[in-house]
């Protein structure tokens, strides 16, 4: 199972609860290289902390929980930088990322 392998490879699952309800989760991993499966492209990450594969429970969407979990992660005390990405067509994810204080660096295209 892909998710079990992530734990074996020291990936971290980040989970947000609200009033005892699971509302949002995503993955975090520190690495030198990263494969963006959505566009089948490998990138050099130089030990960035990669944030990826986030999910918000449908009934909790559009309530700011994605932004909240990203702000909590961004405020983590670390000297490392974060890399977070989404598809160009995923307007809501892009909005949440920018509203959480992350900056747009560049567009990566399929090679």
Per-region residue spans from a language model:
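Short, basic/aromatic recognition patches
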Residues: 1-13
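Conserved acetyl-CoA-binding loop-helix of GNAT-fold acetyltransferases
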Residues: 53-76, 95, 99
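Conserved active-site alpha-helix within GNAT-family acetyltransferase domains
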Residues: 88-108
């Amino acid at each position: 199972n892909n998710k079990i392998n992530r734990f074996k490879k020291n990936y971290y699952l980040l989970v947000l609860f609200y009033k005892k309800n699971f509302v949002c989760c995503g993955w975090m991993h520190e690495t030198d290289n990263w494969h963006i499966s959505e566009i089948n492209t490998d990138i050099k990450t130089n030990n960035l902390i990669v944030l990826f594969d986030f999910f918000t429970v449908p009934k909790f969407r559009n309530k700011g929980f994605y932004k909240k979990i990203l702000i909590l992660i961004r405020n983590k005390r670390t000297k490392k930088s974060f890399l977070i990405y989404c598809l160009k067509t995923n307007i809501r994810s892009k909005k949440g990322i920018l509203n959480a204080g992350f900056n747009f660096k560049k567009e990566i295209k399929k090679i």
